[in-house]
C-alpha cells in the first residue's frame, strides 16, 4: 500500500526539521503555520466581497461590514495571536514535549491521517458545543463571550475574534485530538490548517452551493453558524449539527429554514 503512504515526503520533512530545529518548529513554527493558515483562509473570502457575481451567495446581504469594522477586527485578532496565543504556546512548550509531541516522528499513512483529522473534528466539536453553550449563560456571556458576538453578520476574520480567556478555553478542544491519536508535528499542522479553514469558512458570511463539505453528513457550514451570530442563540456546535439536533438547540434554525424554503418553492411554482 505504498501509494497510501507519506514516505515519499518524509526525507523532505526531516530535512526541514533538521534545518530549523525541532524546538523552534514546535513553538514558533506552529505559530507561523497558524498565521499562514488563518490569514490564507481569510483572504479568498475577503476577495469575494469585490466580486459582484458572488454577492448572491451572501447569507446576510443587507448587512455590510464597514472598512473600519473590518480593520478593527483584523487588528484585535492579530494582537490576540501575538500576545495570547504565542505566549501560551511558549509557556506550554515543556509540557507538550513531555507528553511526547515530536517533529521527527515517522509520518502517518494517508488513511490514518484522515482518520485522525476526522476524530479531531468530532472531539473538538463535542468539546466546543458544551463549552460554547455554557458561555451563553449569565456572567460568562456578559463578560467573556459577548466579545465574539460584536459582529451579528460575521466575516472570515471574526472566527478568532474573542476575549483572551475564551481563546484559551476553546483552544483546549483543538489540541485534545492530536495528542490522543497522533503526537507528531506534521499531523498537528495538517489538523490546524484544516480546522482553521473550517472555522474561517464557517464565519465567512457566504454559503456556496458547490462547497464539497455539503456532502459530509451532519456538517453545519456557514449558513448553520451564521444563524447563531444573527440571533445569538442555538446552533452551538463548531462543525457538525447532530448535537444541536439531539438537544433541540437548532429547532429555531430549522423552523426558519423550513419557512424560507417553502417561500422559495412557492415563488418558483408561480
From Swiss-Prot:
Gene Ontology CC entries for this record: endoplasmic reticulum membrane
Species assigned in the record: Dictyostelium discoideum (Social amoeba)
MF-aspect GO terms: C-4 methylsterol oxidase activity; iron ion binding
- EC number(s) per entry: 1.14.18.9
Q: Which InterPro entries match?
A: Fatty_acid_hydroxylase, Sterol_Desaturase_Related
Q: Which protein is depicted?
A: Putative methylsterol monooxygenase DDB_G0269788
Which segments of the protein form a coiled coil according to its record? Answer: none
Cystines in this chain: none
Catalyses which reaction(s): 4,4-dimethyl-5alpha-cholest-7-en-3beta-ol + 6 Fe(II)-[cytochrome b5] + 3 O2 + 5 H(+) = 4alpha-carboxy-4beta-methyl-5alpha-cholest-7-ene-3beta-ol + 6 Fe(III)-[cytochrome b5] + 4 H2O
Coarsely, its chief localization is endoplasmic reticulum
